[in-house]
Amino acid sequence: MKNSNSNPEKIYAAEKSRYDEFLKMNLSLDISRGKPSSEQLALSDGLLTALKSSNDCIGISDYRNYGFLDGIPEAKKLFSEFMGIDVDEIMILGNSSLNIMYDTLQKAMQFGIMGNEPLNKQGEIKWLCPVPGYDRHFSVTEEFGIKMINVPMTENGPDMDIVENYVNNDPSVKGIWCVPKYSNPQGIVYDDETVSRFAKLKPAAPDFRIYWDNAYMVHAFKQDLPILNLLKEAEKYGNADIVYMFGSTSKITYAGGGIAFMAASVNNLNDFRKHLSVQTIGYDKINQLMHVKFFNNVENIYKHMRKHADLLCPKFQVVMDTLQEELSDVASWYNPVGGYFVSCDLPEGTAKRTLELAKNAGVIFTPAGSTFPYKYDPADSNVRIAPSFPPVDELKLAMQVFCCCAKIAYYEKNI
């Protein structure tokens, strides 16, 4: 923070006075979740007119009727090209990739994977969790009673020495969560070496799987950063079965109202499909067709995402500018070039207090600790900031409150 070497008591008193002014404003601001703004959602309103009559619902079949358990052919073609995989390596499944991940793990727990013993009959099982990471991932493995192990993130992805040591030597390790492109919350893109090392893993457990969540694969702010295709890399080494890839259009079109997909080897998809055929007759084919008609090709998806970037960039710049102006001396953060979040590391032992003060002032953040398994951040320092939803003026004010609270929490411990 600016002037941190000046009189601490004087700075603390000034920030307390500033905080009191914020309290008088009766604020109600929420930057806790990565929700698209109304302006972003409006970019996809063409979906609502993509189908104009019942005739538009006819493809190789009448898509108003039953059938096509794992997606209509048109959607499979579009999104297999989008994911850079073969058309027989994808399934179109509902509206939520998180739901697919939950379902996939549930099936592994109850039925086992490709003939292996169900996970819930194998005693204690473990899961690798790159940190800081996505809170909803951790909630899934916690719900199933799986022991979660922290793996530190580096600027190139998870610490692969740690990953390889666990996966290649411990048969109780059954999976790892990954957000490989513009990671949640840091915005890191896994480099080629990291992806290649994932593809070359030699798991001690035959039922180990990488849960590769491509939530932000086209969410660049300016120039897109390339990333190796994990499934194709794994195929080179005869290792395709260790990969599950997930994605959705939730932050491309309508949040929670888009379509979601899973990409994997034919072996994995066949294993999943045999249970899926009991679970459902099929998903919303009309919504799938609407997305196909709206986009038509992959290039149009990228053009669409540039419109999102135009709306998001000014908001992320507000966060960067405010952090730099107010907290540069004591806090650290990644300057993301894509994705939906900013990860800020405050002085150790101050994150909870900072967000408590912010909440009392009417500004809500993702709770401290949420970016770690069991909601426990050992350093009590990491805060996830979600700039996407509020208008710029509200975001500026929220960030000012955040920085004020961070300073107060810091000086409470250091005076």
Residue spans for each PLM region:
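Conserved glycine-rich beta-strand-loop-beta hairpin in the small C-terminal domain of fold type I
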Residues: 306-320, 331-345, 359
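Conserved core of the PLP fold type I
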Residues: 61-206, 217-238, 403-414
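Conserved core segment of the aminotransferase class I/II
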Residues: 93, 235-313
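Conserved C-terminal alpha-helix-loop-beta "cap" of PLP-dependent enzymes
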Residues: 16-24, 268-269, 273, 344-384, ...
